[in-house]
């Protein structure tokens, strides 16, 4: 559909305004109720302790919680079978993965059941628990004093355990798991790997890899894995690694929906998230290089782009094998503090007000820039950086993306702009393959 004439109508700023409204007034609030329903484990008393009671709650909530609990149990059983198939004795079959995805999507889709209650008495979009300045200082000040040691890699690629794989369309799909480098995030990190089939693999030798990170709240491992434009690179012989970012999917924090702690915990949550995500991507780069030997690009969309751009500068302090060779950014921004205080999604969810209520000002947030924003030039040449910007992006802010491109002196041939807002910019990849073709040409030349 996006490649048809209808795509010209959809991929416009009006779409982004509508998407923003749906996210802030419906998706995030319903996700808030859903998260507490999952945590309640069927108990109405526990659910009501977390969220205020409503007139219709006594009738609807017990029935909803019963269904949520059944779906949770079904997903747990499917995930146990999945672990046995792909990380245990097997056999690794596509039907096992299809069952896991189906059960996960069925549970995720129960958000809609809370719509009648939300209409009666709106749920909050975020359960705020912003960490105070003294606590953040205590936990992260040493990292701020020594930027060169702020993202120290303590594990090597040997810590990564690959799963069995299965043929899925144009490639062989599998997963990676390894210990999370930051205890505050949780014990386990995950990534999905798509490897080209032998015929496509022979087109590029040694084989390049792209490590591509998703945006906030995007949980393809739970909503349903789709062959998005990025994974189309498999046909060209490029392996694709899709990390499951901290606090998303399998890594979701109890009483939270996917990505919520990044917002709810304030500056402390951002520092923990980027600390873990950056180290994890660096480790995936090293694993990719050790297993195929070809050039490795890192990239991402929105929050994933903010993570990848930080990897690109932090990697100066890492061993050679952990340094990416190229960068692919969709909707990035130079200043995260501006995104938090001025971005339309942040403002629509109440981030600035929550930070200010906890005593955080823009100036105090700016102090932590060296741990949140790219400082200095990327580890790779500007010629190896490809950027896609939406000229009407008011979420990660178009001017922030332009500032990054200018500061890094990215060649004009590597910068692509579309007349779109934040959400439609990423969708534009399905319509215009030029940015990915440019990345492919760079990786081919590097190989």
How would you name each of these model-derived features?
Residues 1-175:
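N-terminal targeting or regulatory segments adjacent to alpha/beta-hydrolase or S9 domains
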Residues 183-258:
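Short, surface-exposed "cap/lid" segments of acyl-processing enzymes
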Residues 336-337, 352, 391-397, 422-423:
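Acidic catalytic loop of the alpha/beta-hydrolase fold
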Residues 402-447:
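C-terminal catalytic histidine-bearing segment of alpha/beta-hydrolase fold enzymes
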Residues 310-360:
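Hydrolase active-site cap/lid region
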Residues 254-291:
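Alpha/beta-hydrolase active-site loop
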Residues 299-308:
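Gly/Ala-rich beta-loop-alpha elbow adjacent to hydrolase catalytic centers
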Residues 380-382, 386-389, 393:
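Short beta-strand/loop motif that positions the catalytic acidic residue
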């Amino acid at each position: 559909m996006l490649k048809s004439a209808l795509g010209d109508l959809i991929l416009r700023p009006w779409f982004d305004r509508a998407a923003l409204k749906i996210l802030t007034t419906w998706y995030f609030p319903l996700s808030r109720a859903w998260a507490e329903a999952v945590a309640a484990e069927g108990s109405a008393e526990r659910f009501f302790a977390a969220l205020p009671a409503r007139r219709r709650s006594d009738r609807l909530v017990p029935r909803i919680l019963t269904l949520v609990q059944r779906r949770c149990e079904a997903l747990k059983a499917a995930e146990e079978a999945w672990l046995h198939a792909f990380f245990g004795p097997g056999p690794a079959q596509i039907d096992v993965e299809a069952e896991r995805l189906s059960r996960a999507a069925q549970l995720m889709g129960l958000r809609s059941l809370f719509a009648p209650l939300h209409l009666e008495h709106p749920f909050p979009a975020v359960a705020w628990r912003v960490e105070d300045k003294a606590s953040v200082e205590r936990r992260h000040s040493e990292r701020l004093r020594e930027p060169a040691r702020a993202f120290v890699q303590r594990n090597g690629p040997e810590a990564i355990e690959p799963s069995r794989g299965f043929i899925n369309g144009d490639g062989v799909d599998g997963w990676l798991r390894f210990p999370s480098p930051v205890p505050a995030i949780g014990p386990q990190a995950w990534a999905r790997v798509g490897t080209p089939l032998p015929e496509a693999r022979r087109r590029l030798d040694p084989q390049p890899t792209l490590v591509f990170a998703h945006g906030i709240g995007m949980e393809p491992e739970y909503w349903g894995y789709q062959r998005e434009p990025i994974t189309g690179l498999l046909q060209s012989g490029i392996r694709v690694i899709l990390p499951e970012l901290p606090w998303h999917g399998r890594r979701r924090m109890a009483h939270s929906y996917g990505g919520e702690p990044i917002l709810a915990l304030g500056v402390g949550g951002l520092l923990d998230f980027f600390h873990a995500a950056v180290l994890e991507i660096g480790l995936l780069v090293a694993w990719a290089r050790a297993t195929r030997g070809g050039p490795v690009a890192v990239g991402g969309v929105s929050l994933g782009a903010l993570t990848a751009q930080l990897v690109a500068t932090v990697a100066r302090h890492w061993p050679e094998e952990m340094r990416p060779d190229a960068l692919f950014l969709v909707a990035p921004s130079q200043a995260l503090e501006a995104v938090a205080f001025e971005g339309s999604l942040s403002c629509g969810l109440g981030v600035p007000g929550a930070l200010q209520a906890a005593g955080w000002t823009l100036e105090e947030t700016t102090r932590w820039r060296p741990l949140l924003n790219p400082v200095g030039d990327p580890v790779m040449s500007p010629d190896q950086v490809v950027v896609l910007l939406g000229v009407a992006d008011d979420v990660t802010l178009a001017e922030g993306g332009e500032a990054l491109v200018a500061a890094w002196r990215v060649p004009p041939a590597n910068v692509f702009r579309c007349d779109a807002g934040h959400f439609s910019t990423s969708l534009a990849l399905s319509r215009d393959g030029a940015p990915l073709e440019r990345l492919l040409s760079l990786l081919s030349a590097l190989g």
